[in-house]
């Protein structure tokens, strides 16, 4: 079977538009947007894991907050006690900065101004 040049050109003329038509339909863009509810099994599992981690660290966060608040209260009380000690009418009262207490100069005992 001998195919002549004119038959090849004719066949090419028929197949080329078909190939172009198929290639454009294969690569056609779509303008549809798929919106998921976000309620997939993976997202639920991820949310459950995050909640579990948040709950596990809750005690630690509370301890840190309580410790910080306790230290602040202690420093605040010491500041007030220092002011009271320094303004005391007792001339033997002095403020001990290392122990944060008001002491008597003569005895070294704690006094309340």
Curated annotation (Swiss-Prot):
Protein name in the entry: UPF0482 protein YnfB
Secretion signal, residue range per the UniProt entry: 1-28
InterPro entries for this protein: DUF1283
Keyword Ribonucleoprotein: no
Keywords: Signal
GO CC aspect terms: cell outer membrane
Gene: ynfB
Top-level taxon: Bacteria
HAMAP family from the UniProt entry: UPF0482
Native organism: Escherichia coli (strain K12)
Stated family: Belongs to the UPF0482 family.
Pfam families with a match to the protein in the record: DUF1283 (PF06932)
């Amino acid at each position: 079977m001998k195919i002549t040049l004119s038959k090849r050109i004719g066949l090419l003329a028929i197949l080329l538009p078909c190939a172009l038509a198929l290639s454009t339909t294969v690569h056609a863009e779509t303008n549809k947007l798929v919106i998921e509810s976000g309620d997939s099994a993976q997202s639920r599992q991820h949310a459950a894991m995050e909640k579990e981690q948040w709950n596990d660290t809750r005690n630690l966060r509370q301890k840190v907050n309580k410790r910080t608040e306790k230290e602040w209260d202690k420093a605040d009380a010491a500041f007030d006690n220092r002011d009271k000690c320094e303004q005391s009418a007792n001339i033997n009262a002095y403020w001990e900065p290392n122990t944060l207490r008001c002491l008597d100069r003569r005895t070294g005992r704690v006094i309340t101004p």
